[in-house]
């Protein structure tokens, strides 16, 4: 093992990277409330793992979506547990995100020179809420259907562009298969991809600038 490590160390300077990670200064005023962002990240990773597991059984069609969720909950080994963890972790992720935003705002973490960190954080907050909205509809039960109908109908109040925007969100004039396909694509591909872009940016900025001092 020593020879293998030496080969990697010679080429990649692993020890220098490890020292940089472990020797980062942590201000003395930091408390448990500064862990809310990390808890949000942990919830997101749980979401990725459990969501990936559910894609093996979920069928994104209006005729089979609800039945596939029922099958997952009643027939698949530990399927009920996987979906329950996914649902609980989703609620926890939204809650921790909200508390994290409040903590950052109240401690002045959005001020110069951390404006871009704040901007990426707000984008991640919007993505988190979008995950909740799109995921809520995927079982395609009565709650999910009417939630989608209400949410996608809100932009209709916007003058001129309201109706075209509603049709863009739904994929047609009414809520149906096109809507479910759009929400499934958003939930499982587009939103995770955007999160994978902005989350490293957010953490790298925090890593570079450090934790802000007390007010």
UniProtKB/Swiss-Prot annotation:
Q: Which GO terms describe its molecular function?
A: electron transporter, transferring electrons within cytochrome b6/f complex of photosystem II activity; metal ion binding; oxidoreductase activity
Q: Tell me the residue numbers annotated for binding heme b 1.
A: 100, 202
The UniProt record lists the keyword Mitochondrion: no
Any note on cofactor binding? Binds 2 heme b groups non-covalently with two histidine residues as axial ligands. Binds one heme group covalently by a single cysteine link with no axial amino acid ligand. This heme was named heme ci.
Q: What else is known?
A: Heme 1 (or BH or b566) is high-potential and absorbs at about 566 nm, and heme 2 (or BL or b562) is low-potential and absorbs at about 562 nm.
Give the record's subunit note: The 4 large subunits of the cytochrome b6-f complex are cytochrome b6, subunit IV (17 kDa polypeptide, PetD), cytochrome f and the Rieske protein, while the 4 small subunits are PetG, PetL, PetM and PetN. The complex functions as a dimer.
Please tell me where heme c binds in this chain.
Answer: 35
Q: What is this protein called?
A: Cytochrome b6
Source organism = Pinus thunbergii
Annotated membrane topology: Multi-pass membrane protein
């Amino acid at each position: 093992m020593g020879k293998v490590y030496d080969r990697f160390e010679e080429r990649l300077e692993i020890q220098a990277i490890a020292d940089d990670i472990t020797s980062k200064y942590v201000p003395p005023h930091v408390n448990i409330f500064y862990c809310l962002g990390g808890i949000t990240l942990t919830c997101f990773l749980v979401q990725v793992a459990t969501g990936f597991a559910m894609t093996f059984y979920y069928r994104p069609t209006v005729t089979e979506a609800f039945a596939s969720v029922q099958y997952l909950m009643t027939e698949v080994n530990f399927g009920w547990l996987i979906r329950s963890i996914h649902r609980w972790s989703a609620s926890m992720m939204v809650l921790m995100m909200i508390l994290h935003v409040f903590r950052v705002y109240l401690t002045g973490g959005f001020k110069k020179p951390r404006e871009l960190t704040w901007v990426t954080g707000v984008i991640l907050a919007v993505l988190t809420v979008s995950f909740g909205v799109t995921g809520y509809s995927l079982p395609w039960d009565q709650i999910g259907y009417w939630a989608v109908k209400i949410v996608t109908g809100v932009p209709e109040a916007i003058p001129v562009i309201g109706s075209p925007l509603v049709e863009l969100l739904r994929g047609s004039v009414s809520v149906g298969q096109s809507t479910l396909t759009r929400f499934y694509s958003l939930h499982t591909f587009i939103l995770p991809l955007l999160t994978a872009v902005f989350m490293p940016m957010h953490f790298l900025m925090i890593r570079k600038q450090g934790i802000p001092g007390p007010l």
